[in-house]
Each structure stands twice: as C-alpha cells, then as structure tokens.
Amino acid sequence: SLLHLLDERIATQSKLIEELESLIKGLRVRLVQIEKGNIVHLNEIASIYQPQTISSTELTEDGFLVYGANGIIGKYKDYNHKTEQICITCRGNTCGMVNYTKPMSWITGNAMVINTDEHLNDVCKRYLFHYLSAYNFNCIISGSGQPQIVRTPLEKLEITLPSILEQEQKAMILDMIQAKIEINNRVLSLYQEQKQYLLRQMFI
C-alpha cells in the first residue's frame, strides 16, 4: 500500500540522515582532537561579546531574523549584525549550542558572539563554526540553578588553526555534508506530511 511505501521511505530517509550526522560529528571531532597547526586562544582570533537583548514582546511578524538561546526565535524590525556570525548559547539548558547566523540578523544577549570579521586573513569562519560545534563546553559551563557560559573562560579556549587554505578546504567538505543533511531533512518532512495527509483522508 501507499502508506507502507511511505513508512519504508521515512525509515530509509531517517537512517540516511542519521549516518550523515554521525559522519559530520566524527569529522568535526577530528578537527579538535587530531588537527595540526598553530594553537591560539579564541580571543586572539575573535571579538567575543554578548549583544543587547530584546524582549519577546518586541518581536515582529516580519523583518530580520532574531537568534536567541535556541537558535532562531522570531523576527525584529532591525538587525545588530550585518555579516553572518558564529554564536554560542550562553544561558539555559541549551548552553554551549553553536549557531551560524544569517547575514543581517539580530543576536540577543542569550548568545555569545564569536566575531572573526577582523581576522578573516587568518580564520575561515565556517571552519571555526565546525570546530566549535565539536567542542565540549561542559568544562566552562558554570551556575548550579541556570547553566551559563561567561566570557573569560571562553576567551581562553585553545583553538588549533591550520593554514587558511586548509581551513577553507576542510570547511567546504563539512559544508557539503551539512547541505546534504538539510536537503534530506526537507525530503523527510515531505514524506511525513504526505503520510499525515494520507492518514487524514483514510479517516474522513
């Protein structure tokens, strides 16, 4: 039946996404554990800061994307970053989650911005994003009630940087896998929507 066929496709698609996510995770971990290059502190290659927070009541129907503790949380009439940025959640249960923002976005104070715009000759932004995505931030998360990351220990994180050319090559490979994951997630969503539609038709 069509329903059975969709179930099979959903299962196959889910397995494929799982394998790709496992692959990118393994490759990112290799960047942190095995990479050879110059060892630098994060504050030597980036400006690290918490931007101004806006309240949820200020969010709008349309406008520029707003990034908070859980990635995109809504839209706002203005932006506080013209270029795309790496940001790390620094408050709450998702503390240590790494996001890569779209250009012209508003980043709130619930995230710490790792701004490498003044170091683009030494740092490939996408490489650093993948590198930090594999980093275990538990060692610098503080606070018993609400977990948080403060700036000082973050500034002292040791990062291994190969040549800019090598960074760009590795980032390109990881970006290709990331793009495949996103495409396959969209396909999975379509299959799931088709299944829901089919189930609704059966019970009308």
Regions found by a protein language model. Give the residues of each.
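Amphipathic alpha-helical coiled-coil/heptad-repeat segments
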Residues: 1-40, 158-204
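A short, aromatic/hydrophobic, helix- or strand-capping loop or linear motif
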Residues: 56-59, 140-142, 185-189
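Short, functionally important structural connectors and interaction interfaces within domains
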Residues: 29, 46, 51, 59, ...
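Non-catalytic DNA-recognition/assembly elements of restriction-modification systems
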Residues: 19-23, 30-68
